[in-house]
Amino acid sequence: MVNVGINGFGRIGRIVFRNALEVGGVDVVAINDPFIDLDYMVYMFKYDSVHGRFKGSIEAKDGKLIVEGKPIHIFAEKDPANIPWGSVGADYVVESTGVFTTIDKASAHLKGGEKVVISAPSADAPMFVCGVNLETYDPKYKVISNASSTTNCLTPLAKVIHDKFGIVEGLISTIHATTATQKTVDGPSHKDWRGGRSVNNNIIPSSTGAANWVGKVIPSLNGKLTGLSFRVPTLDVSVVDLVVRLEKPADYKEIVAAIKEASETTHKGILGFTSDSVVSTDFVGSTDSSIFDSTAGIQLNPNFVKLIAWYDNEYGYSRRVVDLLKYVAEKDGAQ
């Protein structure tokens, strides 16, 4: 059992907690959030506009959050260095505020905890994606990143294609659901003028670092991919559009067969597969990192193909945070 503390009880923090309860093997013993009081935590965890009402029991009692009869310590510290993770046995910390995303900033948690998993991309922390590069993890790392939801969708698919056919180069578009940092009505956004426009009635072109992060996770693809995103007015579930030039010619049926085989073997539970005529809401609550849509892709010639993969950018990503915690704890214990 991995004892975990969660810093930041926003979208990802709450859904990581839900996943931990579903999967088992990860015991959330403490939550820190200076901006949400205990009674409001109960409400926010119980009700969710996308993923529905929490079906278990939850209440506030004696200054603790009681979930399924189990007490969880609650802290309200703004400085991670002041969170007493050690006093409650939280050995591993999920840093899900979106603020402390570098090694230097996230290391403040190490005054109480033993290891930090950042639920966001990091400029300098080692980045790991389940099904892609976990074997490169070293227990000496104290702060690591679970990358982004888009990277978790893209890289398993890219790895399968690259290993089987070779990727010469490629372009990525991600059509991405709304996130909390976007504006509901037009407002100031000095660094990203388009990002200041209302998400409710616009398709908003934006940047994505996912293509660059692929190169960190799969070094042989470094510099071979680049991309952009479009933010769209949906609440959850996004889709990656990957266009690649292949080293080895292959017809679309061969490519589909390779992905289907991986989804049933090496990447089972990470890379899903569907041949149904699906739309985005069909994947709300999906725990796969990436679901390849075999009927949505197209091919121009044997070396040039467009591949489509869906992902629940909240739930699927949060499940990988839990999986990464379990993997890391197992490897640390094997030392």
From Swiss-Prot:
A Pfam family matched in the record: Gp_dh_N
Cytoplasm in keyword set: yes
Subcellular location: Cytoplasm
One cellular-component annotation, GO: cytosol
Binding locations of D-glyceraldehyde 3-phosphate: S148, S149, T150, T179, T208, G209, R231
Residues the record marks as site: Activates thiol group during catalysis: H176
GO BP terms: glucose metabolic process; glycolytic process
EC code: 1.2.1.12
Stated induction or repression of this protein's expression: By salt, cold, heat and drought.
GO molecular function, one term: NADP binding
Keywords, comma-separated and alphabetical: Cytoplasm, Glycolysis, NAD, Oxidoreductase, Stress response
Pathway: Carbohydrate degradation; glycolysis; pyruvate from D-glyceraldehyde 3-phosphate: step 1/5
InterPro entries in UniProt: GlycerAld/Erythrose_P_DH, GlycerAld_3-P_DH_cat, GlycerAld_3-P_DH_NAD(P)-bd, Glyceraldehyde-3-P_DH_1, NAD(P)-bd_dom_sf
Catalytic activity: D-glyceraldehyde 3-phosphate + phosphate + NAD(+) = (2R)-3-phospho-glyceroyl phosphate + NADH + H(+)
Chain sites annotated for binding NAD(+): R11, I12, D33, K78, N313
Family, as annotated: Belongs to the glyceraldehyde-3-phosphate dehydrogenase family.
Subunit structure: Homotetramer.
Name of the featured protein: Glyceraldehyde-3-phosphate dehydrogenase
